[in-house]
């Protein structure tokens, strides 16, 4: 049965403006009439950049905390590039590392504007790559919709402009790029990521040790794949960020919920072209309900707004789904995964929130920010067939825990 995005009624209690509702429908109509809907497929990759010298440590972290494993490595004029994969039908993960510590481009400049991002000026979630039947036609259509794309003279990194991908400019609203690719990501020779390289044996041994730990503790069948990813934006830019993403993708606006305890909202966009969100993970935008200067009248919590003021508009966390079930150790699978990772030295922001008894529900937890990517890793277990991405009480607890870890103390302002 074909999904009808035009007649779909978004879920949730977050009220959107008449402007948002009008243009949400207009965007759906234009995607279809322009041919964009027919050209776009599921999300095929996510891209992250780390600082020079951090790539191997970050790869070890990824091996420990999730299902991604190295498929190939490349070297371009400016970067080492690592292609990781999990299941064939799930998006790939591309990690970029500048060849020199002095490397500077638009990511560096963007990070330097924010006090808690400046310490890792080249570390950033870059964006997603969507499958395209004809990426140049996608670019042509989107440029006619006032979406800007990078060309080779506009940025130093050849992955952005001279590879098999075409990438948009970083969004003014989210800081994220969106890329498009018509080639098979398993055809490494066609990707144009640079010269393929072999990693030193000592690096491969490090990765093998982490992989062996994961297999010995049976983490690999439990942590299944990317479930969703959440970008934090400013209060006044929530609707614009969502509408821009809908313009550039084939996702639909699934729904939005107020998280009153944290004075924020969670806004979810999903792909209708897949039956499993892990094949094309949901895109979530979170934002404060009021800007900081207005919020000061009532002194309400504002950890989401504070994050943007301290780190900038950017991806906040990537969430892995944990297979639902009772572990042999007498606890839920997510509790076992988290306990095992804690014993290995992985730090978490709080205890697992939520409960799984006899009714459908969720258990979730946030790790602390990665020292390499600045991203938080979330684990989520949907118990008894729970449908959805969160409960309000879980999100409130997770947001509060993250907010305590994301403060910037200066002068008389503690945010």
Identify the role of each PLM range.
Residues 54-69, 139-145, 237-254, 336-344:
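Amphipathic alpha-helical segments
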Residues 248, 252-325:
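Long, well-ordered mid-to-C-terminal structural blocks that present hydrophobic/aromatic surfaces
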Residues 1-39, 41-53, 70-75, 82-95, 110-142, 167-170, 225-236, ...:
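Vicinal oxygen chelate
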Residues 97-99, 105-107, 181-183, 279-297, ...:
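Amphipathic N-proximal alpha-helical interface segments
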Residues 204-212, 222-227, 231-245:
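Charge-rich interaction segments
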């Amino acid at each position: 049965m074909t999904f009808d995005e035009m007649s779909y009624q978004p879920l949730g209690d977050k009220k959107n403006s008449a402007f948002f509702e009008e243009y949400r429908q207009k965007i759906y109509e234009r995607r279809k009439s322009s041919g964009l809907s027919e050209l776009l497929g599921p999300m095929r990759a996510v891209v992250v950049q780390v600082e020079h010298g951090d790539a191997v440590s970050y790869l070890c972290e990824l091996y420990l905390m999730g299902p991604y494993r190295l498929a190939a490595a490349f070297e371009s004029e400016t970067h080492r590039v690592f292609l990781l994969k999990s299941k064939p039908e799930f998006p790939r993960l591309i990690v970029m590392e500048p060849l020199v510590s002095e490397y500077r481009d638009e990511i560096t400049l963007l990070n330097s504007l924010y006090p808690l991002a400046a310490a890792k000026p080249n570390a950033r979630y870059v964006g997603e790559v969507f499958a395209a039947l004809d990426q140049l036609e996608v670019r042509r259509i989107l440029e006619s919709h006032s979406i800007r794309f990078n060309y080779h003279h506009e940025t130093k990194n050849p992955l952005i402009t001279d590879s098999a991908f075409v990438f948009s400019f970083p969004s003014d609203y989210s800081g994220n790029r969106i890329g498009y690719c018509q080639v098979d990501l398993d055809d490494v020779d066609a990707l144009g990521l640079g010269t393929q390289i072999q990693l030193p044996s000592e690096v491969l041994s490090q990765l093998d040790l982490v992989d062996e730990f994961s297999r010995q503790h049976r983490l690999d069948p439990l942590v299944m794949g990317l479930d969703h990813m959440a970008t934090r934006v400013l209060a006044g830019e929530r609707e614009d960020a969502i509408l821009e993403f809908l313009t550039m993708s084939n996702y639909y606006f699934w729904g939005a919920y107020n998280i009153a305890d944290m004075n924020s909202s969670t806004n979810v966009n999903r792909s209708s072209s897949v039956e499993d969100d892990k094949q094309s993970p949901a895109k979530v935008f979170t934002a404060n309900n009021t800007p900081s200067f207005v919020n000061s009248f009532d002194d309400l919590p504002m950890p989401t707004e504070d994050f943007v003021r301290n780190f900038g508009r950017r991806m906040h966390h990537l969430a892995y789904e944990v297979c639902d079930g009772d572990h042999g150790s007498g606890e839920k699978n997510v509790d076992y995964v988290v306990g095992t990772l804690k014993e290995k030295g992985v730090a978490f922001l709080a205890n697992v929130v939520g409960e799984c008894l006899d009714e459908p529900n969720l258990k979730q937890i946030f790790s602390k920010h990665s020292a390499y990517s600045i991203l938080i890793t979330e684990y989520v277990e949907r118990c008894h067939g729970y449908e959805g991405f969160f409960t309000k009480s879980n999100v409130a607890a997770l947001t509060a825990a993250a907010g305590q870890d994301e403060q910037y103390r200066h002068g008389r302002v503690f945010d």
